[in-house]
Amino acid sequence: MEAYIRQKRASPGMVQASDLQINRPMSGMRSNSRELHAYDGPMQFISSPQNPDQILTNGSPGGITPVAVNTSRNHSNNMRSLSTINQEADLIEEISSHELEDEESSPVTVIEQHQQSASHSANSTQSQKPRARQHSFSDNLDEDDYTNRNVAAAAPVRPAGMASSPYKDATLEGSSNGTGNGTGGESEGDVIGNIDQFVMQPAPQGVLYKCRITRDRKGMDRGLFPIYYLHLERDYGKKIFLLGGRKRKKSKTSNYIVSCDPTDLSRNADGFCGKLRSNVFGTSFTVFDNGNKESTESPRLDLAVIIYDTNILGFKGPRNMTVILPGMTEDDQRVKISSADPKQQGILDLWKMKNMDNIVELHNKTPVWNDETQSYVLNFHGRVTQASVKNFQLVHDSDPEYIVMQFGRTSEDVFTMDYRYPLCAMQAFAIALSSFDGKIACE
């Protein structure tokens, strides 16, 4: 009986488990630095030149045992019923969809509760080991639309998973004062007072402001000079307009006007709040308020400086950025710093001289390379749904789990922007505008 069973199992028409590895055709995409091995879909399983009839799986979703099918027997001996063929087709489709789906980068995919918990646990464990800041050069891509998330050479920062509540593992700076951790110790912010005053006030500690930026590229000139609108998200899909920004047409360098009046985005408007100005190469941006450069009574104040690492050698990878802010006083007010005042130094000069007494330095959180998805990943906790080189999170080196600001794409012209203490809406919006601007030396 045993000999009969062994003979039966050795017959070529039987379905049997196999650990043999076949050399599958590599994906059509190529890169200079890394070869990408990936499944291209169900047709991948029948396009192998070594054995067109062999099916081999590396995983067993849903408890399905990997099998290898050999149909080298005579046609009369390996005729299978239609139901068996349909089952194999369903198996191929299920395995293919299981391997191609990822957790958050596909906005239409619904992740089960246990998968969300497992994803959050993995990301929490990963976040407890902060990586050293990589002073590498940013990638050389200037395109907004990253429809393929598996290009290794042009890998943008993309979401790494979803969680039941945003920022669940982000510790607040004031946790020692009893503000607590994550969403349990903070509330969602709302507009207090007039809009023009609110957008300039630093966010209170323990408050998270969830915002949305929409880009309007409709019209004659808006393809090159789009208008950006910032809204504060509220419950039930409601939103409150905060700021609007546009790029000035006649300017030697990139110059953005920011106003709380969406109908008049000019420097002479009553709602003018400030501006964002870059250097010639687009590697450094300075944010100013609406003060007068020549005035001594209300001089123009520096609100922030954004510096992007240059990419002279053309190294590929996510952008690296440094953000310098004015320091905060004991009563949570910004230190007044003015580069227009000849008696004091601006934020950029203080940072270059390593005089950090009255300034705060932030960095973008270093994304982690994921070999499975062949891309850089960050955990945006459900607030970002599409891959883009513009996606980033700002943190302080002393507390990499406290996300001061995060920004990322949700659709072609819609982006989310969330910020906390010590940023104000004007600072956060200007930082986001700098990521939209083209950068000659960074791309």
UniProtKB/Swiss-Prot annotation:
Residues 177-186 have a biased composition (Gly residues). Residues 113-128, 148-160 have a biased composition (Low complexity). It is found in: Cytoplasm; Nucleus; Cell projection, Cilium membrane; Cell projection, Rhabdomere. Disulfide bonds: none annotated. Signal peptide: none annotated. Keywords: Cell membrane, Cell projection, Cytoplasm, Membrane, Nucleus, Phosphoprotein. The modification Phosphoserine is found at residue 136. GO terms for cellular component: ciliary membrane; cytoplasm; nucleus; rhabdomere. It is a peripheral membrane protein. Its main location: cytoplasm. Pfam families: Tub. Residues 68-85 have a biased composition (Polar residues). InterPro entries: Tubby-like_C, Tubby_C, Tubby_C_CS. GO terms for biological process: protein localization to cilium. The keyword Cell membrane applies. Residues 57-85, 98-189 are annotated as: Disordered. Belongs to the TUB family. This is Protein king tubby.
